[in-house]
């Protein structure tokens, strides 16, 4: 049985930085069930004390020391959070002092700098990419001329969350195409995709894991049947191989890793926002 550990991502901004780094760290450890909670915009002492109380309550509930991944810039807020007795992991602390020495300059304690709306062009690019991902989700729209990437996979293999992550974090216009039973009758690309071969990236998944995911969505249906999952995954993988479409298994791969692999494979040079 997995050991439960409560984890809090605390930030004076959106919390994206703390959560991204924290998630990457936690994936290095097995045998634990991490109960995570993101606390965003903890930017004054009152909010910090409220956060401290919630963290303490979690420790009492689970009878174990909570873990806090903290990206608050104001050190006075971090001190309040530390009163919770949690293990405090400061996102910036290991890097600020060496950088200050190297650059001979003190940091600017600017709240929300990592994900602020300082660059409006960048902000609008992310919003437009997000709208594109939603419009072109699950084959809703099939005009892919403006797409940077088109993720192709069977249903519930991780297409949608990856597209949204690519949009929000990289401003990438990511569409996705769900392979249907009709598509899988052939080992060739569906007609709608043939003109966009260079934009395609295939996602595959272990059939047992796919069955678990589908069972949660449509219990005891043909859609969630293990044989159906095996047949669809096998047919999709044959298609990807025949058409030489780059492919990645999402079974044990985080969205962050999938996104990085997609960008690198398709040669999309984008900075993380």
Swiss-Prot record:
Q: Record-annotated residues binding ADP? A: 153-160
| Entry keyword annotation includes Transmembrane | no
- The highest taxon in the source lineage is Bacteria
InterPro entries documented for this protein? Kinase-pyrophosphorylase, PSRP
One Pfam assignment:
Kinase-PPPase
Give the catalysed reaction(s), semicolon-separated.
[pyruvate, water dikinase] + ADP = [pyruvate, water dikinase]-phosphate + AMP + H(+); [pyruvate, water dikinase]-phosphate + phosphate + H(+) = [pyruvate, water dikinase] + diphosphate
UniProt GO MF annotations: ADP binding; ATP binding; phosphotransferase activity, phosphate group as acceptor; protein serine/threonine kinase activity
The EC number(s) attached to this protein equal 2.7.11.33, 2.7.4.28
Which UniProt keywords are present, listed alphabetically? Kinase, Nucleotide-binding, Serine/threonine-protein kinase, Transferase
Name of the top EC class for this enzyme: transferase
Family membership: Belongs to the pyruvate, phosphate/water dikinase regulatory protein family. PSRP subfamily.
Q: Which NCBIfam families match?
A: PRK05339.1 (NF003742)
Q: What PANTHER family does the record point to? A: PYRUVATE, PHOSPHATE DIKINASE REGULATORY PROTEIN 1, CHLOROPLASTIC (PTHR31756:SF3)
Task: Please give the function described in this protein's UniProt entry.
Answer: Bifunctional serine/threonine kinase and phosphorylase involved in the regulation of the phosphoenolpyruvate synthase (PEPS) by catalyzing its phosphorylation/dephosphorylation.
What's the name of the protein? Putative phosphoenolpyruvate synthase regulatory protein
């Amino acid at each position: 049985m997995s050991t439960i550990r409560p984890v809090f991502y605390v930030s004076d901004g959106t919390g994206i930085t703390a959560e991204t780094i924290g998630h990457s760290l936690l994936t290095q450890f097995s045998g634990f069930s991490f109960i995570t909670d993101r606390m965003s915009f903890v930017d004054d002492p009152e909010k910090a004390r409220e956060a401290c109380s919630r963290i303490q309550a979690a420790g009492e509930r689970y009878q174990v020391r909570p873990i806090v991944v903290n990206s608050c810039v104001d050190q006075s807020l971090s001190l309040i959070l530390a009163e919770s007795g949690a293990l405090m992991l400061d996102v910036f602390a290991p890097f600020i002092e060496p950088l200050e020495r190297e650059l001979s300059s003190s940091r600017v304690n600017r709240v929300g700098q990592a994900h602020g709306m300082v660059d409006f062009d960048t902000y609008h690019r992310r919003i437009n990419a997000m709208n594109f991902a939603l419009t072109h989700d699950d084959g809703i729209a099939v005009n892919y001329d403006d797409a940077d990437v088109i993720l192709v996979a069977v249903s519930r293999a991780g297409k949608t969350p990856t597209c949204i992550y690519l949009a929000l974090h990289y401003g990438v216009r990511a569409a996705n195409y769900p392979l249907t039973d009709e598509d899988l009758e052939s080992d060739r690309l569906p007609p709608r995709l043939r003109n966009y071969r260079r934009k395609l990236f295939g996602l595959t998944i272990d059939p047992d894991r796919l069955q678990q995911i589908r069972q949660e969505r449509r219990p005891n249906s043909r859609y969630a049947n293990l044989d159906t999952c095996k047949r669809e995954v096998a047919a999709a993988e044959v298609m990807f191989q025949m058409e030489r479409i780059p492919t990645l298994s999402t079974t044990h791969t985080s969205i962050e890793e999938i996104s990085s692999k997609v960008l690198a494979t398709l040669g999309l040079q984008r900075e993380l926002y």
